[in-house]
Design a protein with these regions (language model features):
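Sec-dependent N-terminal signal peptides of Gram-positive bacterial secreted proteins and lipoproteins
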Residues: 4-24
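N-terminal active-site segment of His-dependent metallophosphoesterases
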Residues: 25-100, 104-105
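Extended active-site neighborhood of metal-dependent phosphoesterases/phosphodiesterases
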Residues: 28-33, 100-215, 240-245, 334-336
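Binuclear metal-dependent phosphoesterase catalytic core
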Residues: 34, 161, 165, 265-266, ...
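Active-site-proximal beta-strand elements of phosphoester/diester hydrolases
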Residues: 44-54, 173-182, 222, 312-318
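Active-site environment of divalent metal-dependent phosphoester hydrolases
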Residues: 56-58, 87-90, 118-130, 184-187, ...
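Metal-dependent catalytic neighborhoods of phosphoester/phosphodiester hydrolases
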Residues: 59-62, 83-106, 124-144, 233, ...
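His/acidic metal-ligating clusters that form di-metal
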Residues: 75-77, 175, 189-298
Length: 338
């Protein structure tokens, strides 16, 4: 039975937050410590997406209140952090401060025994005292962490997948890809997923397909930096149109608004996608398994839509308060797979 995905954007104002009470490259990744993900008997599975917490060892209490309140309200089966999890070069001068910054955002999940997965953004690796490998080891030390450091097999740190079993446990009914979109290219522009990561994705998808009787396993994909095709959900308008945003990179002399025939939500800054098209989107079309791909990175963008090719792309705006954002609003995105 084909799974249906319902994406729900959650946004709380500052007032609401304050008032709330407190593997090998070709193989399918296995969840850690035997904690298999599985659909409930009612056929549902809930994923919460948290983006750009981007704080220090002295995490803003408003963010922590928001995380706690959202977990209690939605009761997700899995939480995915999509990068810029700590404030990078601002997090502090000791390894212990980095560890504490990570612990601040993970303890709400530990307290509720909720599994989580994580990818990195462009700021995580800017820490002066830890590498992304160091940070991944810190995340993986938690019993409820399903993230995997794939080692030297692939570029980046933390490209893996999480199969979700059917209600009866007999097969993989759904899949989640977690992709490291790296940080900056050789020219200082935003990077993206590299070729060997794309090859890994295709090999993994083919392995899942073979186990599923030759049919692609429907999947969600999460990464920090958007693909350039996010612009397919926008339309170009003349300079000066109210609500328009300036494009990024090769589109920096153009202005855009949300194309309401394809997408809904808001875009309050030009999408800062990877500067070069690495072929990731084309690979999704070829494989036919990506039901939706969702990104963080641009803190004030909260849009979701479907391209003419039939792939759903979307943003989740920032969660943290120690960064720029949409006034006092902060966001999380919920996915109910049914």
């Amino acid at each position: 039975m084909k799974k249906k995905i319902v994406a729900i954007m959650m946004a709380l104002s500052l007032l609401a937050a304050i008032m709330t009470p407190m593997a090998s490259a070709a193989s399918v990744s296995a969840t850690k410590k035997g904690a298999a993900l599985q659909f409930h008997q009612d056929g549902k599975f809930k994923i919460m997406m948290i983006s750009d917490t981007q704080d220090t060892d002295k995490a803003d209490q408003r963010m922590l209140n928001f995380i706690n309140a959202s977990l209690d309200q939605e009761r997700p089966d899995l939480v995915v952090f999509t990068g810029d999890n700590i404030a990078g070069k601002w997090v502090g001068s000791t390894v212990e401060k980095v560890r504490t910054a990570i612990d601040k955002i993970i303890q709400p999940l530990v307290a509720r025994s909720i599994p989580f997965a994580v990818v990195f953004g462009n700021h995580d690796g800017e820490s002066k005292v830890t590498t992304k490998e160091d940070q991944m080891a810190m995340f993986m030390a938690y019993d409820n962490c399903l993230a995997i450091d794939e080692g030297e097999a692939l570029d980046g740190v933390g490209t893996y997948n999480l199969p979700i079993l059917s209600s009866d446990g007999s097969r993989v009914a759904f899949n989640v890809y977690m992709m490291d979109s790296n940080d900056y290219d050789e020219n200082g522009n935003y990077d993206g997923v590299h070729q060997n990561q794309i090859e890994w994705y295709e090999q993994t998808g083919n392995a899942l397909k073979a186990e599923n009787g030759g049919e692609p396993v429907p999947s969600l994909l999460f990464q920090h930096i958007p693909v350039p095709q996010i612009y397919h959900l926008l339309k170009e308008v003349p300079f000066g149109v109210i609500g328009s945003v300036r494009g990024y990179g090769t589109r920096s002399l153009k202005w855009y608004v949300v194309d309401e025939t394809k997408a809904e939500g808001n875009v309050k800054e030009g999408p800062c996608c990877c500067y070069k098209d690495h072929g990731q989107y084309a690979s999704w079309l070829k494989q036919g398994d990506i039901a939706g791909a969702f990104f963080g990175h641009d803190h004030t963008n909260n849009m979701v839509g479907k391209t003419d090719d039939g792939i759903t792309l979307g943003y989740n705006a920032g969660c943290g308060f120690n960064l720029y954002g949409d006034g006092l609003n902060r966001s999380m995105r919920m996915f109910v797979i049914d």
